[in-house]
């Protein structure tokens, strides 16, 4: 296997993807901040809006702790963006729902995101978008396979 140098197309592609990921993260932070929430609170608001929100499952899907999700929920409750009620079927659980204020914030976030999508993405041709999507999917799949293989090898080495 040959070493990858700084001028290599692979290295340049990695730099470009890293820059893209950082830009996406910064944009998400700006959109959230402009709406008065954090990116994490935005994710929870989006999930609550689906009406299938279960805090423990959300924490697991985000590789987060239940305590971290509880903290975000308390912040959203304190900000009057969500309300909580005891579950009908299982009184040990709470049902979370967006308040009118929470819906307004989420609508503003979605509107800002849609405006950004239209301003940035609509200038690309269908072919460019299809090629990018195909490449991104292949790259994601390869990274996932590599990560699973590494985890399996690490687990086997521990046994």
Regions found by a protein language model. Give the residues of each.
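A structural signal for well-ordered alpha-helices, especially hydrophobic packing surfaces
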Residues: 21, 106, 140-144
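C-terminal regulatory/oligomerization modules of transcriptional regulators
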Residues: 1-5, 126-159
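N-terminal leader segment of winged-helix/HTH proteins
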Residues: 1-35, 100
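Anionic, Ser/Thr-rich low-complexity intrinsically disordered regions
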Residues: 7, 13-16, 35, 39, ...
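N-terminal helix-turn-helix DNA-binding core of bacterial DNA-binding proteins
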Residues: 26-68, 79, 151, 157
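Active-site phosphate/pyrophosphate-handling residues
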Residues: 15, 43, 130
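Charged, amphipathic alpha-helical coiled-coil/dimerization segments
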Residues: 25, 75-137
């Amino acid at each position: 296997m040959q070493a990858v140098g700084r001028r290599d197309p692979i290295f340049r592609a990695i730099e470009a993807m890293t820059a893209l990921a950082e830009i996406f993260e910064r944009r998400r932070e700006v959109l959230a901040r402009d709406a008065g929430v954090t990116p994490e609170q935005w994710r929870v608001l989006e999930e609550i809006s689906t009406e299938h929100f279960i805090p423990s499952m959300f924490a697991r899907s985000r590789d987060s702790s239940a305590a971290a999700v509880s903290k975000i929920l308390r912040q959203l409750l304190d900000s009057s963006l969500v309300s909580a009620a005891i579950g009908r079927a299982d009184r040990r659980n709470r049902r979370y729902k967006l308040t009118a204020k929470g819906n307004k914030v989420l609508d503003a976030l979605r509107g800002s995101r849609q405006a950004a999508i239209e301003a940035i993405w609509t200038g690309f041709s269908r072919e460019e978008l299809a090629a990018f999507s195909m490449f991104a999917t292949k790259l994601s799949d390869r990274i996932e396979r590599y990560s699973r293989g590494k985890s399996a090898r690490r687990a086997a080495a521990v046994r």
